[in-house]
Amino acid sequence: MKKVFFLFSLTIFFSCVSKQIVTITKLKGSPIYEKSELKLLGIDSLLSSTDYNFSFQTDNFKLGEQTPGAIQNGLANSSKGQHIHFIVNNDPYSAHYDQNFSKELKNENNVILAFLSRSFHESVKNQKAYILTQVAKNKSDEIDLSQEFLFYSRPKGVYKGDDTKKLLLDFYLVNTNLSSKGNKVRLTITQKTFMHQFLLDSWEPYYIEGLDKGRVSLKLELLNKNMDLIESDFNPSLREIVLE
């Protein structure tokens, strides 16, 4: 059973199927960080063929610092503070609290998105707060980085206790945007026999409430104005999380 709800310029959106009521609400009040920047200074390969050193610079943004309002918003929060979300080929991100770190990459083309993240894992959404690049052994393996991209960020992993009540929904858009007359993102949440769908027409952070304990599947699809799936790498995005 499922219902589809269109989320155009609303604050709270409901999907009600049988006895499970799930809500999606726009997250408000986070520091904007409109002047914050993330710069990639260099990528150096190590002796291992798959290990790389990454060097970044952050401006107007302090890694390791708690974001104002982090405790009050009720979202899962990193005790280590603000950080960089590092995503390879749209796989689950790794969090980095220093500007320099090493990563093991696969022996294939690696499309890398890195962006600034608040301590409660909400991305900083400005044109200078992210980098998109790729690391490939063979030039022929590289993809077109001018595509319209959607990268999945949150929710992620296992949530316990109070952290299960309110889940941040966050994704990162590159070379595209959302509007009531343009592209949109369709969110599908599946839990047991329940399916909930929401259509998002603005690029903002949201939070999900009303899910039961257990496994939850999420799918994000970047759609064009005709509601067709945009043909681009990593579209759609699929994840499974666990609420304990």
Q: At which residue positions do the language-model features occur?
A:
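Solvent-exposed loop/turn segments flanking beta-strands in beta-repeat/beta-sandwich domains
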Residues: 61-83, 174-187
